[in-house]
Each structure stands twice: as structure tokens, then as C-alpha cells.
Amino acid sequence: MEGGDQSEEEPRERSQAGGMGTLWSQESTPEERLPVEGSRPWAVARRVLTAILILGLLLCFSVLLFYNFQNCGPRPCETSVCLDLRDHYLASGNTSVAPCTDFFSFACGRAKETNNSFQELATKNKNRLRRILEVQNSWHPGSGEEKAFQFYNSCMDTLAIEAAGTGPLRQVIEELGGWRISGKWTSLNFNRTLRLLMSQYGHFPFFRAYLGPHPASPHTPVIQIDQPEFDVPLKQDQEQKIYAQIFREYLTYLNQLGTLLGGDPSKVQEHSSLSISITSRLFQFLRPLEQRRAQGKLFQMVTIDQLKEMAPAIDWLSCLQATFTPMSLSPSQSLVVHDVEYLKNMSQLVEEMLLKQRDFLQSHMILGLVVTLSPALDSQFQEARRKLSQKLRELTEQPPMPARPRWMKCVEETGTFFEPTLAALFVREAFGPSTRSAAMKLFTAIRDALITRLRNLPWMNEETQNMAQDKVAQLQVEMGASEWALKPELARQEYNDIQLGSSFLQSVLSCVRSLRARIVQSFLQPHPQHRWKVSPWDVNAYYSVSDHVVVFPAGLLQPPFFHPGYPRAVNFGAAGSIMAHELLHIFYQLLLPGGCLACDNHALQEAHLCLKRHYAAFPLPSRTSFNDSLTFLENAADVGGLAIALQAYSKRLLRHHGETVLPSLDLSPQQIFFRSYAQVMCRKPSPQDSHDTHSPPHLRVHGPLSSTPAFARYFRCARGALLNPSSRCQLW
């Protein structure tokens, strides 16, 4: 589009040049116009020189015009990264579809049956980590790098894992006192076994205990006690008939585990059945989160002594002290409990079992541990788990999980235990200083556009606008990876306690203990930094309310979403819209009922209703639905994020010439901007969309585009077309 504007101005410029030549040639004194005989040779020479000078000026002016045209107009980007992106767009889009009626299919029509764009990028990032881990290097002995590579290789050594068989797991069971299933059981103290399971193996059979922020003081850590994480779907989410089938399948799975560990089939059946009975009774004690929140019982502060009175079967002090070493706990230590009634009922059940069926209680705990550790065991355990997952997904009408290669599992586990080490290696290769600098410049442009936009929102008064602008100005941004993750000297210290054993299971258990100790230690720092909720190679950005920081991991700022060599239209349309979306989450509280008392609530409510009606009017593919009460905040961030990114891009074009385009697409820079935005949303609709806080992919494309007048202008959409409605909403 810029090139076209430039060519329209060219004739006017040349007309002015011609005029200059005419004026120049007429400049002469009255004396020179007299017919003096002796001056004729000089006059001829002067005319020749004048003509040469005029021709030279015209030539220079033409060269200048050509140079400006070449540098201001959109030139095709012929680099390898641009050609790869061009091919990606051509492969995923269906340009036979009219963009003004179905831009999602225009951009994603051939990509509907593939994974979504974010999943594809996540897989690429894991492949990069795989290549890093499989390159032979000479690392400093005992370093985090050496241990990470050794752990990955141990995970990939399936021959050694198969050869070890159940031996390493049997040793663990013996250390815990054994169980009746194998015929060897020592009647140990129940709380001693529970303490070992929690502190040494990261297994919590009856409740969950973890460190989290204090409800009233987000930067103060506090131990939190919650319902356990069950290995089967919760009963309230399933119909009664399906619920019974689910437990039958789970019983079959537990029988397989007991048999694989050498148990007598009749004993295995008996103990597995009672384990299922215990789980079923624990299910009955659960109360939904919404109910607890409505009753004001989701965050209850109690001391360890008080908890001991409520649930006396558990030795809370010794179990928690062992789990959260090096914290120093006392009976007066305050805890946050998320379901007191569950803990009371759970304690009564444990006391009943200890009186009558202590050995079955031991088997229940051991079976749960075997389930937890099964990913580190041989192929027989893996196959049993795969069959259970397949059956459960069929019963709950979920699509089958695609088979995952072994390397991906090993990359993920290595990343869990050695995140700082892998973060440094990943960032060094995929997010160097020049890439980070370009990403920060993009973020600055997006942030400035948001601040400008806040000044013109009709539903904000001046005081609220100033408050909002200050909040954006004070925001911290962490780009690529946290500083903590990129300090190799810290990584070396953190891994000193990891002892990689002779079996893969032993190595996993050592890493589990080390990771738990590191998490506790990080919470105990006097001035803790923001703890990232994602790994640097992940593809999810987020905003932390408690720390007022926005995080963009290096894994997100990769092709096809971002690259310093891409046309600016691509970076602003894809990564820029994501950045703007996350920034708008700073103000989600203002959009909630009563969240902005100083705002023009009538205008705000009208904008709410307008946006909801706007999204409800769009047609959806069959078997696709969404809940507008769940998706409203994300819809608002999608619409506003696109508008802010476009505003930032338009300002960038005014200040910086020389934009490029992707060759062979026949799209202007502005059209590429919108295409890049839509490309981010490419994925197949899912039945789970009805429970998602994000709208289905069609709506995430069509909702924001139809709310943006510039889209209809650049794609020349007829008035009244689906993506050029007669009226629009403005919230942000």
C-alpha cells in the first residue's frame, strides 16, 4: 500500500522539476538579451552548459525518486526465515475462501486437522531441547549441565530400565515396610510411613500439602493443606453409570500393578478392591470449590495444634516438618486449610482402618505410590497406564491421546528437574541478545500504544485514566527467562544434592527430593524474586497480579510468532497482539461488576452487553459451543489486544520506512498484520471449548477482526459483510 501511494506522487514531483528547469533557463540580464556579435560563441557555450546542468539535475532527481520509492515501498523479504514463514502461511491457509466472510478459514483452512499453533510451537521447542541434550559435550564435573545430560541419557536408556525390571521399586516398598500383596509386611507406624511418602517420595495419599502465598499477604509463604489429587476423574463431573465403569477400569489397572510386582492374584484382587473402596469414600467427603468459596470456607487459618484436634489421625507436626525442611515448625504454626470438613472425615476413615484393617491401609498407600512412580518403570507399567488412560478418555468422551515418543517424555522430565540449566542452554541458542532487544522494542511500542489508548476511553474518568496509566508505567516485564534461571553458578549449587543412581528410578527419586528442597528454599528467601509459573521454553505468557509483572517466555517469542528478521507486520500482528492481550489483564478487575466505582458504569455496562451480543451473533461450526460468562474477559482482551497492536504498528509505519512483505502472498503490510494475528489462533475446535475461558478459535479470529474498522478497509469488505458489521463495540 505504501508503494502505491508513492507512485501516485511521482508525476507531481517531476512536474515541479520541469518547472524549475524553465525558470532557470529564463534567467538572464537585459544586456545579455541584446544581439552582441562577439558574445554569440559565449552564449552558445552557456546554453550548452545550462542544458547539461539541467539534464544532470533531472537525472539526480530521478535517481533520488527511485531510491525513495525502493526504500519506502514494501519490498519482498527473501531471507530464509521469511521464506519459511511464507511457506507456512501458504500451507495452512485457504485463499479460495472470501476473507470478509470467513477469515479463519482464509488463514487456517488447511490447518484445521492439525494441532493448534501453540502446540506446534511447543513441540518445536522440545525438539530444540532434544537436539541440545543429544549433542556430546564435555561439561564441568558435577555441574548442572553434566547431571542434566546424564539424567536424560538414563531416561532414554530403555534397555537398562527393562533389565532392572521391578527390582528398584521392590526395594522402595521394602524400605516402607512392605505389604501383604507380596507376602512380606512389617507392621510399621502409620504416620512414619506417611511421613516417608510425603518427604522422600512426593506422594500425598490422603491430602495435599504445599507452600503457597498467604491469602492476605501474597509475598508471605504459608503451608497450605488441600484435598488430594486423585488419579481418576471426580465423581461430580460424571454420570453415576459412567462413574461405576471408571472405577471398574481403575480396579483392573491396580490388579495389573499388583500382579506385575509379584503379588498373588487373589490377594491382589482383595487389596485392590479395598483400595478402590477407600478412594470412593474419600470422594464422598469432597465439597466443590464453588461451594466452599460461597460458604467462606476456602481459606481457613488454623494452627498445627488446632488441625491436630480436628484431624487427630495424622501427626501433622512431624509429617509437615519432614516435608518442608529446612523450615522450622512449631505447634502454633499457622496453616491455610482449604477444606476442613474433608480433613475431619478423612481422619475418621483412617482411624477406622487403623483399628480393623491396618494392612489394607498400607496397601492403599503403596499402590498409590506405585501409580505415582510408574512413569519411571519398565514398559509393562507404561502399557498398563496407557490402556487405563485410553479407557478413561473413551468413557468421558474425550479424544484419544496421541502416542508420544520416548524422547519427549525424557525432555519434559529433564526440564522439570533441571530447569535453570536447560533454560540457560535454550536461551543461549534460541533467544540471544539481539532477539531479546527486538522483543523489548516491540513490547515498548505495545505498552506506549496502550497508555495512549487509556487516555481516550469514554467509560474512564480522568482520575481512573491517570491511575491506569501509572499502573502500566510501573509494570515489570520479564522477557525470555528469569535472571535467576540464567545464573550458572546458582545452578551448580542447587544440584549438589542430586545423586544419580544405578537405576533410573533411583535417579528420579533423588531429583524429586532435590526439587522439593529447592522449592522450599526459594520461598524462604528474604526478598524472593517472582517465581515463574512457566518454563522459559514454554509458549504461555501471563500476568501476575501479586507481583505486578508480565512474563513472556523465550519459547513463545519464536517463529512463526516472532523473529527479528520478519516483516514488522508479522511481529506486531502475532507477538504484538499477544503482548497487548496480556497487558489488558492488568485491568480485568475494572471489568467485573462493581470493579470500578469511579467509572461511567452505564457506558461500561453498555460496552459489556454490546460485546456479548456481538460474539453471540457469530455462527459456529457444528458441535462447537462456548460459555460467554466464562469467556468475556478473554474476549475483551482479544478485541482490545488487536486494536492496541494495530495502533502500535501504524505508529511504527509513520516513523520508520522500509517495510517488507512476505513474497508470493499478494498481501499488503496491513493485510499481513491481520493474517499474522489470525495465524496465532489456528487450531481445531474442541468439545472442551464449552468449559474454556477462551472462545473457540473461529470466534477468537472473527470477533476481534469484525470489531476493527481497519480490517474491513484493507480487505475491502462490503458494508454488512460478516466481518464488516454496521455497528461495532468499543470497550478498550
UniProtKB/Swiss-Prot annotation:
Protein name (Swiss-Prot/TrEMBL): Kell blood group glycoprotein
Pfam families: Peptidase_M13 (PF01431), Peptidase_M13_N (PF05649)
GO cellular component, one term: nucleoplasm
Membrane-side (Extracellular) residue stretches: 68-732
Organism: Homo sapiens (Human)
Effect of residue 248 to Q: In KEL25 antigen
Membrane-crossing segments per the record: 48-67
Main location: membrane
Domain of life: Eukaryota
GO molecular function, one term: metal ion binding
GO process annotations (BP): establishment of localization in cell; intracellular calcium ion homeostasis; intracellular magnesium ion homeostasis; myelination; negative regulation of potassium ion transmembrane transport; potassium ion transmembrane transport; protein processing; regulation of axon diameter
Active site (record annotation): 582, 638
Location in or out of the cell: Cell membrane
Effect caused by changing residue 382 to R: In KEL23 antigen
Regions of this protein lying in the Cytoplasmic compartment: 1-47
Effect listed in the UniProt record for changing residue 249 to K: In KEL27 antigen
EC id: 3.4.24.-
Annotated tissue distribution: Expressed at high levels in erythrocytes and testis (in Sertoli cells), and, at lower levels, in skeletal muscle, tonsils (in follicular dendritic cells), lymph node, spleen and appendix (at protein level). Also expressed in many adult and fetal nonerythroid tissues, including brain, spleen, lymph nodes and bone marrow.
Cofactor note: Binds 1 zinc ion per subunit.
